[in-house]
Amino acid sequence: MSDLKINGRGRSGQVPMNLLDRAVTWFHPQAGLERMRKRAALAAASGYVGARSDRTSLQRWAASVGASADTDTLPDLEILRARSRDLERNDPMAHSAISTKTANVIGSGHVVRPEVDFSRLRISADEAEAWEGQALDIWNNWAESRDCDVTRAQTFVELEDLVYRSRLLSGDVFVIRRYKERPGRLLGTCVQVVEADRLSNPNWVSDSDRMAGGIEFDQDGAPAAYHFADRHAVDRGNIGGVVWRRVPAFDDTGRRMVLHIHGPRKRPDMTRYAPMLAPVIEALKQRSRYSEAELMAAVVSACFAIGMASPDGDLSEGLIQQNKEGATADSQIVLTDPGQIFDLLPGEEVKSFAPGRPNPQFAPFIDAIAREVGAGTDLPHEMLVKQFQASYSASRAALEMAWQFFKTDRALHVSQFCEPVYEDVITEAIARGLLKAPGFFTDPLRKQAWLGSTWMGPSRPTIDPVKDANADEKYLAMGVTTRTRIAAERFGVDYRAVRRRIERESAVADNPQSSSVSEDVSPRPGAADQERGKGRNRRGVKLWPVS
């Protein structure tokens, strides 16, 4: 009996006989026929073509059925991270995807604008603005110092870049809240960034319901603790072995001790996250190999490629493998240097050949791959390859589409990293008495009101600033936007700071003789004691008195 053909619901197909079907048919043809009819009926009853197994195009599709998010993700993370990092280091298109997203989501860093809810706190708008200025001074003093990093290597802006870039490359990254008092510093709050590889199950035990990917869970599935290795497993000089440290997810007050920075959660119960390049790793690697082959062919075409025909036998018999120093004297196929003159042995003749490069199909093929990579990384093709050769409307639409993705990513980054760190800094400042915030530690609603903030990132990409300015002016006249929002979105600045600066510049322009030293200038060297006597610390940041 051959495969049984079916025709049902307007579709036709073929049910292939497996080994068991053939065995049943061999011993009992009638039972085998009935078995095939039942299988055909089941295949015809399938509601979705994509779920059918009788089609040749779907027979070898080995998709996991009934597997959890961790089962589908955790076993592949190690190799996905390694390949993503290798591509980012060596592949121009992968590097462009990571750098373009980082430049537009992080850029030169986010600027915070404290915004307390003065109506809930029952204070005046002027009092709220004064408090916000104090909080901003303390934040800037902390964020602009490299002491905010436990390794004392990066400022907060640089930490932002590191955290976001690591998230894209590794899928997730972790920030541990630390406390270290250092001489000359107002606050002891600092953070430690830990790479994704170092979070793993102690002694590499298998995943279970209570621990997976280095994260320990409670009975509700919420993180209870994180297990960090003290080093990477393959570090050189790792004589003493790897030691794991258990860090509680929350402290006694319910504050998160570890910030898990990752992309959008795509499935329930998802523990760890795949790198951004995961969907396009194969396409990027194949494109890289093809590009290398075409480049080598172009180099060969540009040189004088020769083949030496010897009367002693077949050419291939004289070929030997090249060593690290290049072709040896016994090689029979060589690329000559420009203008080189060479001698032939008796009986040898030279046959030249050309590989026919450049290939006219190279650019269209690379462009098609770039579009595929852009779709897989949520980047328009134009931004990925840094070329805007389409029409004005198409280029503008590409920027608008990219801006939607950047806004989403930026909001996630701010909520996962910037806001929690800002809240830590302000909380310590209040606890030390540097800021006065009644009810902060006793009323959760008042605490939330004191910690309100807005974050401004890189400006929105544009290709026609004049049209955008005209549109903003009309939106402002309609009352559907604000100057604060326009300043933040178009220029990445705080409108209130811009307004104050304009007022000062206008005053100087109206009365040039009254020009004075800018408020932004730091105290001159040697005047630290005088400045502290005036209510400023040694870095020139005002220490607001607390009554």
Put a short name on every predicted segment:
Residues 1-167, 183:
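Extended, helix-rich architectural segments
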Residues 2-4, 18-27, 33, 350-352, ...:
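Activation/maturation switch segments at domain boundaries
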Residues 94, 98-260:
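Structured, mid-chain assembly/scaffold modules that mediate subunit interfaces
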Residues 129, 340-463, 502:
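Surface-exposed loop-to-helix/strand elements on domain peripheries
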Residues 133-144, 161-169, 173-176, 180, ...:
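A broad, structural surface signal
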Residues 154, 178-179, 297-303, 384-388, ...:
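Short coil/turn segments at secondary-structure boundaries
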Residues 154-160, 176-194, 314-329, 421-457, ...:
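Charge-rich, acidic-biased intrinsically disordered regions
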Residues 254-395:
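Extended, charged amphipathic alpha-helical segments
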